[in-house]
């Protein structure tokens, strides 16, 4: 494996679109929205130069921010450790003062009522352990919005039978749009 910082934009885009955790925050277009930030794209390649992991880093005054990144196989703890170790070295080399990471993989799934016992319900403690072993500090599994800069929870609704559950008026409006 090799850590790189000169990823071809097409290779980067192809990789993120195939990744289960791809979000707009790691897309090249996000750097156009955040045009008052600098950015870097880093990654890990195998011996055949195939991307195994990547991240788009937004940079402002020494702060490096990976919104919903890195993108990689979070079941591969060896890869995660390799990425984090090399990201830290790269950040130090480039004089970053802070590296903030909001990983895209949920550490817990469930209803809000059960989140009070989060440490017991974590989907995969290995991810947190990988970050801790690479000297990243975890802000904790807080419950209040005021404790963090980003929202802690994402509301997700399953869309099975979604069209059937819409009100009649909404269904009619959707049909009108389809006819246009």
Locate each region found by the language model.
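Acyltransferase donor/substrate-recognition loop-hinge adjacent to the catalytic core
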Residues: 1-7, 123-180
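Short amphipathic alpha-helix that is part of the acyltransferase structural core
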Residues: 1-28, 179-180
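Short amphipathic alpha-helical segments and helix-helix/interface helices
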Residues: 13, 31, 81-84, 88, ...
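Short Pro/Gly-enriched beta-strand edge/turn motifs at strand-loop
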Residues: 22-29, 36-38, 137
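Amphipathic coiled-coil/heptad-repeat helices and related helical stalk/stem segments
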Residues: 26, 83-84, 170
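Short, solvent-exposed loop/turn elements at beta->coil junctions and helix N-caps
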Residues: 28-33, 142-144
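Conserved donor-binding loop and adjoining core beta-sheet/short helix segment
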Residues: 31-117
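Catalytic cores of TIM-barrel enzymes
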Residues: 84, 91, 103-147
